[in-house]
């Protein structure tokens, strides 16, 4: 009888311990979500910005070129604070179910230890890990590059603007020709002091902003090939009946770049003047792109504001550990969610650089084709 009683006691104790262990495991696997995605951003060390530029570029390249994990349009890709790709999901039948699927995936990643935290997203709130849709209905990068180079009829033009003449009706110019002509003319007139190494950035903007479409208009009322607002065009002295004039748009964009350059260069050099020349130049170019997109005042605050400039101060002191892209992106990444800074600024900058790379590849291919043609002709 005593033996039976002892046996029952042991079984009871073992069952209790097993239940306790089960609760312990469940507690370890159930990770409560952060309240907001900005909590995740604020708790991550600046040092974890290493690699963010290349990682974001990779994800955006998949989207713009419809490649890798974005060959199917009805997908979302998820990535972490460093921009590392984590996974993708197939979209559900509607946006609400897709959001639920994203949140389940986020929670699962946290429970598996793939991310240190998760945040539930909804129609009004960004979730974490971050997610972006593969389908970008207004993007056709290859066609936009063709327009820029004048390979597509929509990209060819002739006309006059404020003392500048480009092309003729019988020998029309490309948008590339327009950019080069306007830049050279304004430099000769000493109206701008922009270094010529900024021209590839403007070329990227001509490709990305509107796809080279003259009549493009955004929901925010930005218009034309460089998506300039009526206010910006007025500041440039462009009359209302010339807002879509492509030469005028390029001229105005150069003026805006010049204005931003004059505003930002002194404070940039005060913060990053000690960087090696090539790295310093690359960081500055990326910040100028962000200034064109979000306004120079916002970028200036990243360099001078007591709170917003903390990431810049860290990267300036430890620049050897980061690429130029990591520094420029890190300054924005660690300020996301405040001062009206959002992912659009990072995506825009990445897209400009991707457009530049595609343009360079197209130019190389065209040159090789031309050389091959000359070789065959000479045989």
Residue ranges and their predicted role:
Residues 239-249:
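A short, structured beta-strand-centered segment in the mid-to-C-terminal lobe
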Residues 285:
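Conserved glycosyltransferase catalytic-site signature
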Residues 237-241, 276-277:
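Short secondary-structure capping micro-motifs at structural edges
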